[in-house]
């Protein structure tokens, strides 16, 4: 979807998205039904609407662009999904990420006004609300507001990471101090 949408940026061409992936996070954000028949009916009966796109390093994205603990967890979970099903791959991913994650240095610049250099645990630039099959990384994001939501979580000691997980899963990580 992302590659197709990138080709449509700055055009008036509409794109209808039928869910066929594993997470379907952007579908959830825009309110399209998750079953393909209902999604097709929805696309054919609802008017097209413009949505924001983001651009990082000359690549467009529609949902969320990010890095850090959350992405490492999902990488490990996808690896484990080849062998086990259900919630187990995600639990494995979290536990392995807690054990191996190292904070990363980020240089963030927004226009000429805001520059940050810091060690981070998570950095997400969000147009959509969800990642990883429904985790509300940016619960306040709106794909039609003309803005991208930026979530930066400072690096914390490894032993504190589990205390951040409930906020991540509930969509309130942006409130965490």
Can you annotate each of these PLM segments?
Residues 9-10, 78-79, 139-142, 166-170:
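Short, solvent-exposed amphipathic alpha-helical segments in soluble enzyme
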Residues 70-73, 116-118, 131-134, 158-161:
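Short acidic/glycine-rich loop or secondary-structure boundary segments that cap or lie
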Residues 2, 6-14, 18-121:
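Catalytic core of DAGKc-family lipid kinases
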